[in-house]
From Swiss-Prot:
Its EC number is 3.1.-.-. The gene is ybeY. This is Endoribonuclease YbeY. Zn(2+) binds at H116, H120, H126. The lineage of its organism: Bacteria, Bacillati, Actinomycetota, Actinomycetes, Micrococcales. Keywords: Cytoplasm, Endonuclease, Hydrolase, Metal-binding, Nuclease, Ribosome biogenesis, rRNA processing, Zinc. GO terms for molecular function: metalloendopeptidase activity; RNA endonuclease activity; zinc ion binding. Binds 1 zinc ion. GO terms for biological process: rRNA processing. It comes from Renibacterium salmoninarum (strain ATCC 33209 / DSM 20767 / JCM 11484 / NBRC 15589 / NCIMB 2235). Coiled coil: none annotated. Belongs to the endoribonuclease YbeY family. Pfam families: YbeY (PF02130). One of its GO terms (cellular component) is cytoplasm.
Length: 157
């Protein structure tokens, strides 16, 4: 499993934990061992540009996902094929604001956003109530299992 973190934010962050979480999610969702993922930690200005360019919305957001190969979770008997999962872009400054609002640590928020971004790359969405319940339920389940305690509550920018 190849997980690359590129920290362009200028903020020191727990990059190794993001890699460890990503590998954990890969295993839990039966992704091929040669699956590739890139996590980019961007400053507020860069994230705002991406948000406007790709989502046509002003202001920085917390996380954006850019899928490459259309990979989906596998099963025990049928793991997902190898491929390039895509890029997750996270804005640590927005994550810090959300962590404060949510009453949890910045590290917990970064782990939450990484999980959220991974699930988007795997085809999950939260546009309607059923999709949201499925995605957020899986997100909580994965994070709770990874952390060995309750996952932090979801926050929004």
């Amino acid at each position: 499993m190849s997980v690359e973190v590129n920290n362009e934010s200028g903020v020191e962050l727990p990059e190794a934990e993001l890699v460890r979480l990503s590998r954990f999610v890969f295993e839990k969702l039966y992704l091929h061992p040669q699956t590739e993922l890139s996590i980019i930690l961007a400053d507020r200005e860069a994230m705002e540009k991406l948000h406007v360019e790709w989502m046509y919305e002003p202001g920085a957001t917390d996380v954006l996902s850019f899928p490459m190969d259309e990979l989906r979770p596998g099963t025990v008997s049928r793991p997902a094929p190898a491929g390039l999962l895509g890029d997750i872009v996270i804005c640590p400054q927005v994550a810090q604001e959300q962590a404060q609002a949510g009453g949890h640590s910045v590290e917990d928020e970064l782990l939450l956003l990484t999980t959220h971004g991974l699930l988007h790359l795997l085809g999950y969405d939260h546009e309607d109530p059923e999709e949201k319940a499925e995605m957020f339920g899986l997100q909580r389940e994965l994070l709770t299992s990874f952390l060995g305690r309750d996952a932090p509550a979801e926050t929004t920018a």
